[in-house]
Amino acid sequence: VHLTADEKAAVSGLWGKVNVDEVGGEALGRLLVVYPWTQRFFTSFGDLSNAAAVMGNSKVKAHGKKVLNSFGEGLKNVDNLKGTFASLSELHCDKLHVDPENFRLLGNVLVIVLARHFGKEFTPQVQGAFQKLALGVATALAHKYH
C-alpha cells in the first residue's frame, strides 16, 4: 500500500492518541457482534451469546488489544506490510483457517471505532488514510491464501 506523506502523517498523528486496550477490544467485539459468523474462530472465549456478553468479555478485550498492537506494528512498517504480517498470514491461513474476508471486515470496523472515538478529529482525509492502511493490512494478512 502506498500512503502519501500527508496520509502517513495523518495516520501516525492519530495513532499516537489511540488507547489500544479500549479501541482494540471494542473493534474486535463489534466484529463479533455485527458479523456473528466470525465467532466460530473464538469458541474458547466463553460467553459470546449476545452483544453485552461479547463487549464485556475479557478474552475479547485481550485479543482485541493484541490485534491492535499488531496493526500498530504495520504502521511502523507501512512500506513492507507483506513482510510484517507474513507469519500472522501463515498462522491464520494454515492453522486457524480464517476466511481472509474477515480481515477486511475488521479493518472497516476499526475505522468505525476510530471515528466514534475521535469524532471531528477523524476527518474524511484521516478516514481515507486509515481505510487505505486497513485494506493494505487485510491484503497482507490474506497473502498466504493466494
From Swiss-Prot:
Keywords: Acetylation, Heme, Iron, Metal-binding, Oxygen transport, Phosphoprotein, S-nitrosylation, Transport. The modification S-nitrosocysteine is found at residue 93. Transmembrane segments: none annotated. The modification N6-acetyllysine is found at residues 59, 82, 144. Heme b binds at residues 63, 92. The modification N-acetylvaline is found at residue 1. GO terms for cellular component: blood microparticle; haptoglobin-hemoglobin complex; hemoglobin complex. Residues 2-146 form the Globin domain. The modification Phosphoserine is found at residue 44. GO terms for biological process: hydrogen peroxide catabolic process. GO terms for molecular function: haptoglobin binding; heme binding; hemoglobin alpha binding; metal ion binding; organic acid binding; oxygen binding; oxygen carrier activity; peroxidase activity. It comes from the Eukaryota. InterPro entries: Globin, Globin-like_sf, Globin/Proto, Hemoglobin_b, Hemoglobin_oxygen_transport. Red blood cells. Pfam families: Globin (PF00042). Gene3D superfamilies: Globins. Belongs to the globin family. Involved in oxygen transport from the lung to the various peripheral tissues. Heterotetramer of two alpha chains and two beta chains. PANTHER family: HEMOGLOBIN FAMILY MEMBER, HEMOGLOBIN SUBUNIT BETA. This is Hemoglobin subunit beta. It comes from Myotis velifer.
